[in-house]
Amino acid sequence: MTTRRDALAALKGTLARLERGVMPSALPHFSLGLPELDGALGGGLTRASLHEVFAASPAHGPSATGFALALAIRATPSAPVVWVRQRMFDQEFGRPYGHGIAALGLDPGRLVLVRARHAEDVLKAALEAARCTAVGTVLAEIWGSPKVLDLTASRRLSLAAAASGVTVLATRVDAAPAASAATSRWQVRAAVSQDPQTGLPGLPAFSVTLLR
């Protein structure tokens, strides 16, 4: 049986190996692919920052994950992505699917997937990954509004991101926005996906609101 300490030690070992590999981009912003939106944001979203992605309701959780993963892909052209996932997400929505991740544009070989039962463990793993200079993006998924995820915890993530150059994306489901150190905050819901030529379901589509 793997203990919390063993799991965290294994993650530290993985991160240490990554630090001997490719370095993330040093550009201060990453484009969202929409010139109008990039312009409104001053050139795109900032790297080395904490950004929050909220599902409009639990039913829109998979869309929030998909949008956050799309941001991670935009932010991280080549460096590893560390995805720290609370097990509640697997129970409610199923496990990440490698072929689907690849179809979205992320090579699964660049993905380090960490699962944790409790929000506290998600935060510990995300903070450890955010301190690793070889990581491009950390995607942390937390269910609900646990007490451990307070303003202080978000500040720790934000400071770690600023120091290392890592972009941190916190996906929240079944949670209301609260005080945090996030640079931006998004609310996501599913949108109708339709191929204009065939009328059949097409690429993933999201309805997104920038809250902050």
PLM-predicted stretches and their roles:
Residues 74, 129, 160:
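Hydrophobic/aromatic ligand-binding patch that stacks against planar heteroaromatic rings
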Residues 33, 64, 93, 122, ...:
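Helical mechanochemical/support elements of P-loop NTPase systems and associated helical scaffolds
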Residues 57-60, 88-90, 119, 144-149:
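Short acidic, S/G/P-rich loop/turn micro-motifs used as interaction or catalytic elements
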Residues 134-179:
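A contiguous pocket-lining binding segment that forms or flanks enzyme active sites
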Residues 170-212:
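Phosphate-binding/switch region of NTP-binding enzymes
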Residues 79-136:
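Conserved inter-motif catalytic segment of the P-loop NTP-binding fold
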Residues 1-82, 94, 100-109:
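Detector for small/aliphatic-rich hydrophobic stretches
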Residues 54, 84-85, 113-116, 139-143, ...:
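Conserved beta-strand segments of the P-loop GTPase G domain that flank and frequently precede/overlap
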